[in-house]
Curated annotation (Swiss-Prot):
It comes from Clostridium perfringens (strain SM101 / Type A). Belongs to the GTP cyclohydrolase I family. Its EC number is 3.5.4.16. This is GTP cyclohydrolase 1. One of its GO terms (molecular function) is GTP binding.
Amino acid sequence: MIDKDKIREGMKLILEAIGEDANREGLIETPDRIARMYEEIFSGIGMNAKEHLSKTFEVHSNDLVLEKDITFYSMCEHHLVPFYGKVHIAYIPNGRVVGLSKLARCVEVYSKKPQLQERLTTEIADSIMEYLDAQGVMVVVEGEHMCMTMRGVRKPGAKTVTTTYRGKFLEDESLKNDVFRMISM
């Protein structure tokens, strides 16, 4: 899906456009390195989390499941610079759960493409609701955006927090508060 030849050509043009010699020793292989890196960091393009969330296990409990501090890296679609941080996923099963590593895979699918943090948050929640048939989902994403750190307002350490709620989390404020308390532990 990734056209590495076009990326190489484009990267060489960018280097030349900023006044660099694209053929000098330190840069001559940069277009190829960027093409390989883009293949990896944009591997979520065209994917959805169904393959990771389709194998479930029966449980006889509908108690809350929280997977917190899932690290992620993504690329801001506005500036194509990284944003990164942590995702916290809480869900209430409907008689079935998924292996915990699959929640991290779900995060990877949606973070490995040009992305907005707000959309990342909702895509994760919507996929868990749909593929796990959960009674409720809450997703909290904490991200630091390099577009705010290294350019523009230049505010290193500023974090953006996005949340979304589905199902029972929309109805029960104490449930949300429980998750926020557990995240801060």
